[in-house]
Curated annotation (Swiss-Prot):
Stated name of the protein: Magnetosome protein MamG
Residue stretches spanning the membrane: 28-48, 60-80
One GO CC term on file: magnetosome membrane
Membrane topology: Multi-pass membrane protein
Top-level taxon of origin: Bacteria
Organism listed in the record: Paramagnetospirillum magneticum (strain ATCC 700264 / AMB-1) (Magnetospirillum magneticum)
Function, in words: Plays a role in regulating magnetite crystal size.
Lumenal topology ranges: 49-59
Subcellular location: Magnetosome membrane
Lineage of producing organism: Bacteria, Pseudomonadati, Pseudomonadota, Alphaproteobacteria, Rhodospirillales
Amino acid sequence: MAAQVGGQILANAAAPAKASAAAGVGTGGAALGVGSGIIASPVGTAAIGNAMLTGKGVCLGLGLGLGAWGPVLVGIAGLAGAAYLVGKLKNCKAEVDAAADAT
């Protein structure tokens, strides 16, 4: 029996089983694509997970080219945005209080 894997036809090979809802979550990486017809093996999913965890450095992966500084700069931008919003809310509250005192 010939099986097609990734565009290649393998002669005398058993066709890999497709993941389905009936296969359950714990078998052969079925949690990745339950019912969607995605073929996943435990070895392949482990290799992908290992490649993601052993990447060089810590980065956000946003394509910004910031490398390890990405999380630091995004954190600083978040703090600056939060400080701006707090100041803006205090200013609005002060204007409302001043208008209430004037009447």
